[in-house]
Every structure is written in C-alpha cells, then in structure tokens.
C-alpha cells in the first residue's frame, strides 16, 4: 500500500543504470508522489537494467517484515528482488550499538525496541542469505560524518519537528552510531567478507557522466 512505504538502496552500475535511476527518481517525485517520492515493484522492474539493489536499512521492506515476524513474506520479497536484479541484489545488514542507555523510561523503551529490532533483522537476513544464496553486505546508516556530530543531528531533528530538544515525545535516534565509520570499526561489527563486499559493489559501478555543452535548462518562450 502506498501509505506503507519503505526504503530501498539503488546504485547505478553504468550509464544505462544512471539513466534508469533518473527515470525512477523523476517518476517517484511526480506520478509516485504520496507525501514522499515513491515507486512500486512494477516500475522498479521496468527500469532495473544497470542497477544494483540493496535491501535497505532498518526501514526497508524486508527488514520491516522480519521485525513484524513475517519471515516467509520477507523471503518472498527477497526472491522477487533477486529475480529482478540477479547477482546485483544484496541483503543489506547494519549494526548500530546502543552506546549510552537513557534513564528516561520512554526513551529507554525506544532504545530497547530498536536494539531488539536490529537483532531480529540481522538473524533474519542471515537466515535468508544462507537459504537463498543471496550475499550480505555491511553498511552503516550514515546521517552525519563523525560521531561527535550526533548531538547536532539531534538538535536538527528537534528543530525540524518544531519541538524542544528536551521534549521526551519528539523524534530522536536511539544511538550516536549513525556516522561514517572506518573499515576498522566495521570489521569489529561484521565478518570480513560481509564488510569487503562493499569493494565488490564499488568495482561494479562504472558510471561516466558526460559534461553537457550547454548545461542551462531550456526555457519555453
């Protein structure tokens, strides 16, 4: 349903993929707009050539199904994506440890829910990977560059929602781990082959964006 949108990671392998990515983005922002830009599986299939697909973050379709206890449905969607993208589909695994537990009951409950959700997702994706032979790749859900910017990001969230920083009911992230981690940090969280699969994906991406002779948009008279 359009009201239950989820996240998906798409990367361009080549110029065909780049053009298809632009088409998908344009469709999502126009015909697919429903509070947020969206696409459905049929449009994704139509413009899938030249694209690499990762299953998404905590809010991805497959992770959401796993958190809801619907592993069979999660497997079915993994099969669908694998049918569309073949060897260019990867199960995206993430770990964002809770480094500081809140003493505020409401916030701590959210942290506990997030931590348990991550555990369920990782176990579920590992099971699907082993069962279907779909490779996993480790990523980090990056929202700021360095760990010490987490407080600024928290303020940004409060300002964006028009609420006070100390408002317990406002939107917030459960940990300060949503930053750009080093290879060493990622290897402390995941098996080496899962981390280094990012290099395999990077080597697949060979987009060459040609410089336009006249980059100015054409305006109707």
Place the predicted regions along the sequence by residue.
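Phosphodiester-processing cores and adjacent nucleic acid-binding clamps
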Residues: 1-221
């Amino acid at each position: 349903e359009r009201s239950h949108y989820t996240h998906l990671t798409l990367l361009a392998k080549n110029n065909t993929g780049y053009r298809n990515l632009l088409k998908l983005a344009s469709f999502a922002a126009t015909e697919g707009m429903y509070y947020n830009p969206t696409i459905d599986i049929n449009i994704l299939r139509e413009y899938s050539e030249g694209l690499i697909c990762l299953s998404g973050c905590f809010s991805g379709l497959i992770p959401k199904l796993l958190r809801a206890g619907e592993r069979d449905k999660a497997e079915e969607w993994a099969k669908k994506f694998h049918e569309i993208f073949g060897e260019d589909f990867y199960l995206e695994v993430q770990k964002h440890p809770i480094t500081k537990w809140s003493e505020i009951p409401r916030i701590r409950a959210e942290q506990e829910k997030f931590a348990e959700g991550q555990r369920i997702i990782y176990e579920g994706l590992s099971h699907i990977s082993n069962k279907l032979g779909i490779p996993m790749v480790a990523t980090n859900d990056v929202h700021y560059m360095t760990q010490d910017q987490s407080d600024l990001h928290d303020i940004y969230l409060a300002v964006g929602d028009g609420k006070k920083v100390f408002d317990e009911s406002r939107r917030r992230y459960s940990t300060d781990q949503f930053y750009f981690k080093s290879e060493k940090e990622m290897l402390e969280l995941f098996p080496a082959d899962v981390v280094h699969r990012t290099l395999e994906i990077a080597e697949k991406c060979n987009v060459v964006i040609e410089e336009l002779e006249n980059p100015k948009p054409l305006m109707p008279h």
